Structure formats: C-alpha cells, structure tokens
A protein has these predicted regions:
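Gly/Pro-rich active-site loop or hairpin
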Residues: 55, 85, 123-129, 133, ...
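Conserved, mostly hydrophobic/aromatic
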Residues: 44, 106, 151, 187, ...
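Non-cysteine beta-strand/loop elements that form the S-adenosyl-L-methionine
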Residues: 104-112, 184-186, 211-223
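N-terminal pre-domain/capping segments
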Residues: 12-96
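Acidic-and-aromatic substrate-binding clefts and catalytic sites of carbohydrate-active enzymes
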Residues: 31, 48-60, 79-89, 159-167, ...
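Active-site acidic/histidine proton-transfer and metal-coordination neighborhood
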Residues: 87-184
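Short, small-residue-biased leader/transition segments that mark boundaries at the very start
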Residues: 1-13
Length: 293
C-alpha cells in the first residue's frame, strides 16, 4: 500500500471561518427579485467566471447585492489538476474580483478541465496517485500565494475511475488538505452521486475527511437513471441526500450550507422554500448533536 504523506509543503495559512448560515447560488434569473424582496437568505455564492468583466449588467447587480449580503466566490475554470501551467491572467482577474466584493472564501473544484489549452467545459476527476497528490499540492500553493488566502476545493461527482488510483478519493482529499493547507468544500450531493456510481459507502467518504478543513457544504439535485446517477443541479434535493446532509451536520457541527440550482429554474419562492427546508433540517441535526455532546 502506498503511504499517504501528511508533512506540510509549507505552513498552512491560518483562517477563522464561522458558519455563514444558509445561502443560495446567485443566478441572473433572480437578480431583480433579490433586490426587490431582500429575501431571508444569509449569503450568496457567485460563479466567479460570470463577473470577470469590465462593467455591464452582471457587475451592476453583483455590486448591488454585495452591499446587502455576504458573498463567496466559486470558480469552474481553475483546472487545478490539469497538465498545463496555471493561467496567471485568470488568477489575476480572480484576485481583482475578490478585492472588489471581499468574499468570505474562494473555491473551485478538485479536477482538471482544460486540454490542449482549451476549456473542456466539464469537471473531470484526477487519478488519485502519489504523483498527482504532490503535483496538485504544489499548484495549490501557487494559487494561494497569488490569492493570499487558502483555496477551498470541492469534490466533484464522478462516473469513471482511473486504473491508476492508489488512494480512495477521501484519502486523497485528506492528504491534499494536510499537504497544501487548502480547505474543502464538501458537496454532499456529489458524494451521494459518486457513491451510487462506484458502489462505495457515502458516509465512509464523509467520516474520513478532516473536519477542521471543511468550510462549506453544497446541496443540489440530480437525475437517477437506475444503473447510474448524474449530477444535474436541475432538480430539488432528494430525500437520501437530505438524510446524508443531516448526518453530516451532526458529525461536523454548523457549516456554511449552499443550495445550488443551475437549470430548470423554479419560481424564486420555491427555491426559498427549499432553502427553508435545509435550515429546518439543519437545526434539527444540530440540536441532536448538542443533546449527544
């Protein structure tokens, strides 16, 4: 068995990050309703790439919403595990946006998404090997040196596995966090999807992550085709994912929780109702945790 090293490549950047509460992904379908209604949402997560522009309608709404709500930034183009050099211009623009809106955190995905210098428009999993571990950890250090803050990385949903794997995904995430000082965005739905597709236990995945490194949770819907499950973000959260979320909060305590929707957008009131469900189930889970403490 290959040993997983946990010696730090550099001193981890210290951070204190209390829970922000319950948030929604900021999507242009809801800009005007957010500003008109000032809904009871604790924070919003913005897709970083949507705002790497000079002026325009998107930045106008972003600035207006940033005056009322805490924000976090979530990227889809970093390609932290990709074979090509990190895009320094992209990182510069990410830092400029962060200086503009002062996000509570900056996240992206543990994946590769560029080939031959072109975006593949997909988030592809890495081979979980020792070589990959050190390669990605070094690239994380480069990103953190530019951003001057810890990078937060999300587990992606997966549909194939590499024959080269030496670790499980959760072992890889654990070691990567220790090596690089990065933090983790635990997507509960992605864990469920990958567990269904690959036949592992979702709770084993979550239980073996370092609790102190988990800074945010994602909830989303998927499509279940029986033999496989696809992460689509176009459905309400299903009951098994809600149950896994509650168990996760009982284990971790309060963690900033985001509800994602990226297609088949419902009326805004329906999304707020689903967020209220997350808040209620979260409160129940945290109450159980307190009673057991």
């Amino acid at each position: 068995t290959t040993e997983i090293y946990t010696l730090s490549l550099h001193d981890a950047l210290p951070i204190s990050f209390p829970s922000l509460g319950y948030g929604l992904g900021l999507r242009n379908e809801y800009y005007e309703q957010i500003l008109e209604q000032s809904p009871a949402v604790d924070w919003f997560e913005v897709i970083s790439e949507n705002y790497l522009v000079q002026g325009g309608k998107a930045l106008y709404y972003l600035d207006a919403i940033a005056e009322r709500y805490p924000l976090v930034m979530h990227g889809v183009s970093l390609s932290i595990g990709g074979p090509h050099a990190l895009d320094t211009d992209y990182l510069k623009h990410i830092k400029q946006l962060a200086e503009r809106i002062q996000p509570a955190l900056i996240s992206d995905h543990l994946c590769w998404s560029r080939g031959n210098a072109h975006q593949l428009h997909d988030l592809l999993p890495l081979p979980y090997t020792e070589e990959s571990l050190y390669y990605v950890a070094n690239r994380i250090r480069q990103v953190q040196d530019v951003l001057q803050r810890p990078l937060v990385l999300e587990n992606v949903s997966s549909y194939v596995r590499s024959k080269l794997d030496e670790f499980t995904e959760w072992e890889f995430l654990n070691a990567l966090s220790h090596l690089s000082g990065c933090q983790l965005l635990l997507d509960v739905n992605n864990v469920y999807v990958s567990a269904r597709n690959h036949g592992f236990d979702a709770w084993t995945f979550i239980l073996n992550l370092p609790p102190e490194s988990i800074r945010q949770l994602h909830l989303a819907g998927h499509r279940d085709y029986g033999d496989y499950v696809v992460d689509t973000h176009d459905q309400p959260v299903c009951d098994p994912v809600w149950a896994l979320y509650q168990r996760t909060l009982e284990h971790l305590g309060p963690v900033s929780t985001l509800l994602e929707r990226d297609d088949h957008f419902p009326p805004f009131e329906e999304l707020l109702t689903e967020l209220s469900k997350a808040r209620e189930l979260g409160a129940t889970a945290l109450a159980r945790r307190s009673r057991c403490a």
